[in-house]
């Protein structure tokens, strides 16, 4: 679906039902496109830990990520700590991972790589 443009440039679409749950072959295609992210929970979620120098930068990242989540209408689970954020994506409405999770993972990584919180 998003193969013609980079994931970070794609936008989330409403996805409901198990027809939108990604199979193993598609997961294997998409995972290399989001370096640093890992499959978790037997392939039902996508996670990555982002590290920061201090709490201020951690929260700045969380706030910027909230804007992305709002714009895409796709919201991660977050574990917020003093110097790191654990981000977890999964699409509850499909019972696992969807294209939206990979789109948002790519956008999240791009935010971090741009050093938006430095």
Swiss-Prot record:
HAMAP family for the chain: Pterin_4_alpha (MF_00434)
The organism's taxonomic lineage, starting at the top: Bacteria, Pseudomonadati, Pseudomonadota, Gammaproteobacteria, Lysobacterales
Reactions performed catalytically: (4aS,6R)-4a-hydroxy-L-erythro-5,6,7,8-tetrahydrobiopterin = (6R)-L-erythro-6,7-dihydrobiopterin + H2O
Alphabetical keyword list: Lyase
Family per similarity comment: Belongs to the pterin-4-alpha-carbinolamine dehydratase family.
Organism (species): Xanthomonas axonopodis pv. citri (strain 306)
Gene3D superfamilies named among the record's database cross-references: Transcriptional coactivator/pterin dehydratase
GO biological process: tetrahydrobiopterin biosynthetic process
GO molecular-function terms, A-Z: 4-alpha-hydroxytetrahydrobiopterin dehydratase activity
Enzyme class: lyase
One Pfam family, short name: Pterin_4a
NCBIfam families, sorted: PRK00823.1-4
Listed PANTHER family: PTERIN-4-ALPHA-CARBINOLAMINE DEHYDRATASE (PTHR12599:SF0)
Official protein name in the record: Putative pterin-4-alpha-carbinolamine dehydratase
Cell cycle found in the keyword field: no
The organism's place on the tree of life at top rank: Bacteria
InterPro entries (UniProt xref): PCD_sf (IPR036428), Pterin_deHydtase (IPR001533)
E.C. number: 4.2.1.96
């Amino acid at each position: 679906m998003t193969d013609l443009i980079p994931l970070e440039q794609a936008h989330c679409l409403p996805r409901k039902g198990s027809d939108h749950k990604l199979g193993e072959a598609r997961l294997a295609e998409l995972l290399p496109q989001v370096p640093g992210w890992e499959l978790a929970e037997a392939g039902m979620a996508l996670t990555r830990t982002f590290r920061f120098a201090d709490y201020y930068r951690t929260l700045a990242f969380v706030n910027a990520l909230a804007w992305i989540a709002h714009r895409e209408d796709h919201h991660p689970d977050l574990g917020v700590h003093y110097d790191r954020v654990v981000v977890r994506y999964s699409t509850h409405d499909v019972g696992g991972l969807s294209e939206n999770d990979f789109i948002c993972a790519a956008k999240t990584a791009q935010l971090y790589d741009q050093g938006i919180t430095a």
